[in-house]
Structure formats: C-alpha cells, structure tokens
Amino acid sequence: MDHTFWLTPGHASEPDSWYAGTSPQGLFRSEDGGITWAPLPAVNDDPQFREWMGSVQDGTPDGPKLHSIIVDPRDPSHLIFAMSGGGVHESRDVGRSWRTLIEGLEVVEGFDAATVSCHDPHCVRLCPSNPDRLYQQNHCGIYRLDRPGDTWQRIGRKMPKRVGDIGFPMVVHPRDADIAWVFPMDGTTVWPRTSPEGRPAAYVTRNAGRTWQRLDQGLPEGQAWWTVKRQAMTADAQPSPALYLGTTSGELWIGRDEGARWSNVARHLPEIYAVEVAEIA
C-alpha cells in the first residue's frame, strides 16, 4: 500500500466502524474508530489484483486506487465501491464476497468492456433520498443505475457536444434523486485535465439526466486552465443546497442556490484534492 485515498464512515448503527480505500487498490475496515484496521480479503487477495494495478507508469499516487466506498443507509451489510482500473463492485455480506456492476459501461476504444480492469470509474454516488439510484462519473461518460436493475445508462450524451461528459466529481442532491451535478473537463485526445476551452462550469440535471443546464455565473469566463478532482466537489444539506469545489490551481469556490451563483472564497492554496462541508451548531 502506498497511501490511504478514501475514508467512509460505516453504517449509522455501527458508529465506530470505518472503511478505507487505498492506492494501489485495497479495502480495509475498522471497528474501533480507526485505531486498528483489518483487510477485506475477498478484495485484497483477489487474483485480479495485479491486473487492477496496471503497469509501472500507472503507479501511485495518481494511478490505481480504490474509492467511492458506499454503505447502504438501509443495510450495513450492503457495500459498493469503485476502482480506477477495476470497475464498480457490490457486496451484500460486509465484503466477504463481491460481484461486479459494469453492465452498460463503456471503455476506451480498443479495449474489451468485458475485462474488469479496463473500466475506470472516477466517482460513484448513492442518492440519500433514493438509495436504489446511483450516479457515476466515469472515464467514459456520465451514468445512472436504477435498482433492481444492474445495467448502467449513459446519461451524459445529452451534455453539449463541445463540452462532453468526461470529468471527475459527481454530486447528488440531498433530497431529490433527480438532481445531480458534474464538473466537466477537457476530454479530447490530449487529456489536458483542464476546463473545456478554459471556461469552467458546473452542469446540473433536474430530471435524472434527460437534460443538462450550464452553471457558470461568477466563474471565470476564460483562461481558467484548471479542473476539479473526484473528491473536491460537494453540496451541503440546506433547503437550497450550495455547492463547494476546490480546484487543481488551489482555489475554493461556493455555488449558492444550487450552483446558480459562484463566488471565490480562497486563492493561492496548494492543489486541492478533497472538499467537505459541515454545519457547525
């Protein structure tokens, strides 16, 4: 293991439990508030582990990693996680066994979609208001999965063609499962990991991906050659949620009224990898 990449608290009924995703890919569980950790061997000892890791040039810290660990709020035994270089997986027995959730997902042209290691989910989110719905920002588009189905639908094809549906973060509304936000990056063959045309914007869907609206009021109108990483965008739980994002150029932005109005609140920070928001009583 090179480093811990993702931390997720366990189910509300298990207040001392935590899950950790690592780079290279590994999944660990703590039952004492993080004092001690135990690997989940069904993941860490999987014979495909070396394939998930990729080659030397795909190494840490920006290469393979296990992320997007989700605990079903209705069932502490039901877990979902994703791997960059290993697809999306689901367990219904606290990680003792797993099944893949890659049906319907596309891969880079020339690769085999039936090969799990060819899949590169960037961020997966479960809707708090409807835990049977998942959204995913993938290396190859934006997707939605509605249970009990097992097939992802690519909902990013309705994004503007000049922008595309490639990016890293995925944010869902705390109370409306039809509302979700993404932050696209330049997904051309160059893959510069910057905003398309240097004009950053969030996009929102209010109908589960049938249409998308650009949200850029207050954001730079040009020459903003940055993007947002998978953990660096989130929303609060206010009646009209605000969005919060950190950029690869070290800026922190708030998008009030569900992202309708953006303002900068900090500059000249290091590259921002994660943003969280908490209400202080």
How would you describe each model-predicted region?
Residues 1-281:
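Extracellular glycan-interacting surfaces
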